[in-house]
């Protein structure tokens, strides 16, 4: 069956979007970011008129919000749209490259954490900045409910965005936004004419197994052929440290630089620009659970030790199949297994 993308559901509706909330409910790999970059951004540029003649203050501008630094880097690469690798880790160099790219006159990319920081410094100054934008894109919108358990500041970002619903086109999009949808429907603020859904399509998982102890996981990994790659999501940086000692050069380990122990391997040392793993094993915390597309046919095994369904769905979605035959085995840590079976059936 031919794969469908969210642009085929939205069609030309975006041309007539009025102020308010838009909800895009579609799985990983459904083309949500592609729609923004290849359809909405060119439309904003077109509506702004001639770049050299138009008043910069009248430009139609987009603010793209996301929840993780790796995703921000990926979005910045997508805004360039030239297929080249840009120096997203070197701000001074990146700044010059962005100034030479016309697209960045119409779109800015922030993390939700930046919204939170700016609001704490001055709500009034933040509002003046946000007033410049016509469209607010909330990518990985499950951040507002998924991260709130351990980060009370997420509600600040959500409140800031919600205040703009009456004066902006605010686009929420995620593969796992059911809690938000339920809330909006309960309070009567979700218009079904502004809700775009693409049913979940068959994924890449061909077999599901459970394990319950570290030793079981280690034995499973040791049984995997050397030419088959492994993606392993763990819950703590300390586990990454132990895995690094255990597997040596066979493994790369990725976690947030904001972690108490700091960063480990750079993302660019873990995954190449084409989405292929640079080692047999890539182990990571939830810092990698979105914002990274792995397009590697040799990635045949995904181990997940989280039990939150939102996180599990996102982590499975890091593998982007290149065709119908590009499949993998999924291994889930035993905790919460009964609740998680539905994710891959």
Task: Label each PLM-derived region with a short phrase.
Residues 25-30, 140-143, 157-185:
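Conserved helicase ATPase motor motifs in RecA-like P-loop NTPase domains
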Residues 61-72, 223-246:
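Conserved strand-helix element at the start of the C-terminal RecA-like helicase core
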Residues 80-123, 267-269:
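Inter-Walker segment of RecA-like/P-loop motor cores
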Residues 127-159:
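SF2 helicase catalytic motif II
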Residues 258-284:
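Conserved helicase ATPase core of P-loop NTP-dependent helicases/translocases
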Residues 308-330:
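Conserved SF2 helicase motif VI
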